[in-house]
């Protein structure tokens, strides 16, 4: 059965790559993380992505992530606004976690390419994504490819995207482009139909929206969520102040990037969030 992705089911706009809270023994602090996700949605962002780079996703076990998903349901977190990082060097782990997310009602999986062995061919990367899709065999699955070459050292080529879209047009839903090259984002917006492009930084939020992209998935949205929301609302309503709102948001991003410095976004943003909330528990990183 050839089912197309319905426009109304996609998560578009301002999405935050959520931080993950940990307890003193480094175990996952499920309640604090979910509460933070609810706070983000209260800032009127459009979606929350758990267990990405900023969420220290690769430091968590599949068991921990599955338990977290179970708690999202128990705590009535809106799953239609949820995306889960499920990528792994292990195809079996990626399939197990994506399957659990799907059966729980979360359709969008953010999938990193296998990243430990460098310089894989497009053929090898195609085989990885293809294997996940075929093993899951679920028409509801929406894979958002994660392009972050500075960290993974595995870039996602346009040829690979084209081939995946040709063979899995109803499953390869989009890409989070954290490469920092806005021309690459705009090129994908132009060249790939029915393919949602998310800027990996709110700096490129408006240009991507104007090119027909889906929006942004941003780490600093943990702090700038409200202003990200304002930009998207202004864009949708054709507010003439949208450029000024974007400029303000870009300035915030630059300040936060500088403030986080060499410690990186995860620990740096946690320090800022801890200070803002007067909550030392947010200082804990894995």
Predicted regions and their residues:
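Active-site beta->alpha loop and helix N-cap motifs at the rims of alpha/beta catalytic domains
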Residues: 2-153
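A general structural signal for well-ordered alpha-helical segments in protein cores
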Residues: 33, 65, 69, 94, ...
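Catalytic alpha/beta core domains of metabolic enzymes, predominantly
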Residues: 135-141, 148-253, 257-261
């Amino acid at each position: 059965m050839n089912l197309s992705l319905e426009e109304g089911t996609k998560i578009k706009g301002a999405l935050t790559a959520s931080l993950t809270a940990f307890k003193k023994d480094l175990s996952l602090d499920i309640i604090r993380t979910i509460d933070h996700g609810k706070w983000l949605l209260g800032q009127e962002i459009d979606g929350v992505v758990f267990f990405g780079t900023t969420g220290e996703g690769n430091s968590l076990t599949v068991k921990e992530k599955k338990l977290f998903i179970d708690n999202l349901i128990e705590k009535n977190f809106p799953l239609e606004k949820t995306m889960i990082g499920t990528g792994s060097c292990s195809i079996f782990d990626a399939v197990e976690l994506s399957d659990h997310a799907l059966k729980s009602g979360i359709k969008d999986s953010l999938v990193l390419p296998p990243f430990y062995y460098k310089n894989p061919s497009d053929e090898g990367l195609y085989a990885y994504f293809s294997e996940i899709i075929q093993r899951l065999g679920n028409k509801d699955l929406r894979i958002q490819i994660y392009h972050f070459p500075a960290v993974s050292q595995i870039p996602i080529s346009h040829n690979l995207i084209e081939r995946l879209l040709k063979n899995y047009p109803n499953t390869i839903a989009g890409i989070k482009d954290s490469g920092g090259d806005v021309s690459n984002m705009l090129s994908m917006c132009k060249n790939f139909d029915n393919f949602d492009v998310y800027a990996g930084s709110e700096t490129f939020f408006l240009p991507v929206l104007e090119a027909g992209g889906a929006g942004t998935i941003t780490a600093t949205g943990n702090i700038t969520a409200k202003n990200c929301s304002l930009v998207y609302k202004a864009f949708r309503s054709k507010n003439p102040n949208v450029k000024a709102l974007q400029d303000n948001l870009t300035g915030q991003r630059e300040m936060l990037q500088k403030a986080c410095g060499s410690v990186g976004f995860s620990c740096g943003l946690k320090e800022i969030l801890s200070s803002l909330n007067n909550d030392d528990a947010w200082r804990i990183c894995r």
